[in-house]
Structures are given as C-alpha cells and as structure tokens.
Amino acid sequence: MTESSFKLAIVVSQFNRAVTEKLLNGVLQRLTELGVQANQIKTVWVPGAVEIPLLAKRLAKSKHYQAVVCLGAVIRGETDHYNYVCQQVSFGCQQVALEYEVPIIFGVLTTTTKEQAFARAGGERGNKGADWADAAVSMIKLMKEIEITDE
C-alpha cells in the first residue's frame, strides 16, 4: 500500500482553535511530505473535544477512511471539567477504534497551560501534529499488512 492509495480523515476541535489549527497544519504538512495528496484527506471541524468521538465514529463506520486523526486541545481550568473532558474524549476515541477496527489517532493535547499547548503545536517542543500524521500512516500500513479476511 502506497501513500497515494488510501484515504484518511481528520476531526478537529474548534475550541482552542489557535492551537488546533497549528496541529492541523502540522498533520497536513507531514502528510504532504509523505506523498499524501489533498484529495485523499477529509477534514471535519467539530465544536469541542467532546464531540470528536462521535464524528470519528461516523467516519470510521463509513468505511471510506483507513484512519481518522483526532485533534484537540484541552487545557486545564479552575474546575473539574478538564478531567471529565479528557476522560470522555480518550475513552470515546479508543472505543471507536476497537469497534470499527479503524486506527483512531488520539491527537488531543491535554495540558495544564496554554503555553504548554502552544509549545507542542509548533513551538519549542515541535508540532505533535507531524507525529500523529506519522502514526496514522504507520497504522494504515500495519492494518493492511495484518489484514484478516472473513472466512
């Protein structure tokens, strides 16, 4: 399987958009470097991180995409909301991957401060989006290599 023979989707949270746009750019730039064309990628924006798993499920269920990259930035505030959001999003994404056997790449930053988020979205810690693009392509290849046929 070559990079020009598959399709993937990206689900991006609009909340903390200044961070998530940078993560998206990191994913798209790396995919381009790997030879993936724009017509192989579908990008969908959702209101917040909690909405990511539902759209990931819809995309995985469609069987049109060999991987779904989920991007978000959950930054700790003064309440417990952060804990609930992080848990729901990570669990939801994992459930989708297991139910549909489609790689769901968990590209949701969970940080204590905005500075930590920006550092990982093209700042001094690099752009994690590139790492998640690599993970998506790697998982697509592994899933194809270990393909199980129904008998």
Curated annotation (Swiss-Prot):
Database matches in PANTHER family: 6,7-DIMETHYL-8-RIBITYLLUMAZINE SYNTHASE, 6,7-DIMETHYL-8-RIBITYLLUMAZINE SYNTHASE DMRL SYNTHASE LUMAZINE SYNTHASE
Keywords: Riboflavin biosynthesis, Transferase
Pathway assignment: Cofactor biosynthesis; riboflavin biosynthesis; riboflavin from 2-hydroxy-3-oxobutyl phosphate and 5-amino-6-(D-ribitylamino)uracil: step 1/2
Protein name from the UniProt record: 6,7-dimethyl-8-ribityllumazine synthase
Reaction(s) the record says it catalyses: (2S)-2-hydroxy-3-oxobutyl phosphate + 5-amino-6-(D-ribitylamino)uracil = 6,7-dimethyl-8-(1-D-ribityl)lumazine + phosphate + 2 H2O + H(+)
Subunit structure: Forms an icosahedral capsid composed of 60 subunits, arranged as a dodecamer of pentamers.
Active-site residues from the entry: H81
Role noted for this protein: Catalyzes the formation of 6,7-dimethyl-8-ribityllumazine by condensation of 5-amino-6-(D-ribitylamino)uracil with 3,4-dihydroxy-2-butanone 4-phosphate. This is the penultimate step in the biosynthesis of riboflavin.
Organism: Coxiella burnetii (strain RSA 493 / Nine Mile phase I)
A cellular component term, taken from the record's GO annotations: riboflavin synthase complex
Transferase listed as a keyword: yes
Annotated InterPro entries: LS (IPR034964), LS/RS (IPR002180), LS/RS_sf (IPR036467)
Residues given in the record as (2S)-2-hydroxy-3-oxobutyl phosphate binding sites: E78, T79, R120
EC annotation from Swiss-Prot or TrEMBL: 2.5.1.78
SUPFAM superfamilies for the chain: Lumazine synthase
Binding site for 5-amino-6-(D-ribitylamino)uracil: F15, A49, V50, E51, A73, V74, I75, F106
GO biological process, one term: riboflavin biosynthetic process
Gene: ribH
An annotated Gene Ontology molecular function: 6,7-dimethyl-8-ribityllumazine synthase activity
Stated family: Belongs to the DMRL synthase family.
